Amino acid sequence: MIDVATTPETTAPVTVFATSWYPFCSQLLADLRKADAPHEVVDVEAPGNEDASAWVESVKNDNRVVPTVLYSDGSHATNPPAGDVLAKLNELN
């Protein structure tokens, strides 16, 4: 088991670490937009996002599982359904 990399800083209540090509990422982001849920998106494959990619890998024992969602309370979830993300968002508010 590896150590969890430094948790990325974010100001959003929900930050989705994603890729542009993976269908589960696209679906989650579409569902969040449809619900008008406040969120931020970090493309883990974009240049300059190596630290974010390392964090995503670290939370699943060196496997990069996307989407990974980071909540403003510091908790996270990997590949969550939109309903779970929206429920957590309501809990945070």
Summary of predicted features, one role per range:
Residues 2-42:
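Local sequence-structure signature of Cys/Sec-based thiol-disulfide redox active-site neighborhoods
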Residues 23, 47-48, 76-77:
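Glycine-/small-residue-rich active-site loops that bind phosphorylated ligands and cofactors
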Residues 27-30, 51-54, 80:
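Generic recognition of short, well-ordered alpha-helical segments
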Residues 37-53:
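Thiol-based oxidoreductase modules, predominantly thioredoxin-like and allied folds used
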Residues 51-60, 87-92:
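Short amphipathic alpha-helix with an adjacent loop that forms part of the alpha/beta core around
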Residues 70-93:
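Non-catalytic, surface beta->alpha helical segment in thiol-disulfide oxidoreductase systems
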